Amino acid sequence: MRGRKLELEHFINQHCVDICLLSETFLNHGQAFRLANSVCHRTDRAIAGGGTAILVRRVIAHLSVPIPGLTHLQATAIQVTMAGKPIKILAAYLSPSSPLIGADLSACFDRGMPVLIACDLNAKHVDWNSRLSTRRGNYCVIMPTGTPVLSLERIPQPLTHATPWLLPTPWTS
């Protein structure tokens, strides 16, 4: 993320992004990351790779929210108020070498408030314009969270690594 900071800042300003959810930040505890007019909440991995962050415009009232009980999933969460009601917003990442555990996903959902999750679970499914479905992708489609899930993964244009910000997998409950 550090090497693409100017590109990210340009994208956020050009598209008037108030809350930006990031995965695979590749930041570690000793590295500072700041953008003008933004507050950065992040979860770094102790080893190389991974990591998540949420950039929030300073004018947006919000709180950092802990997510206890995560085993393999890396996630950063905030709480904002929209239309007078609280909503939890998460950025999450799961390494391809880590197993997808239902308890990790369940820990992200708060039964008391709506949740929006944008994540990179290294999962593929044909419903998401992928040419194949993986076991993780199949699990995500039928994810047993015990709560209604609206999946917004369908992206009209082909997915490419050249446009990583067009690869979200947001879930809301």
Q: Residue spans of the language-model regions?
A:
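A shared catalytic/ligand-binding motif for oxyanion handling
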Residues: 1-173
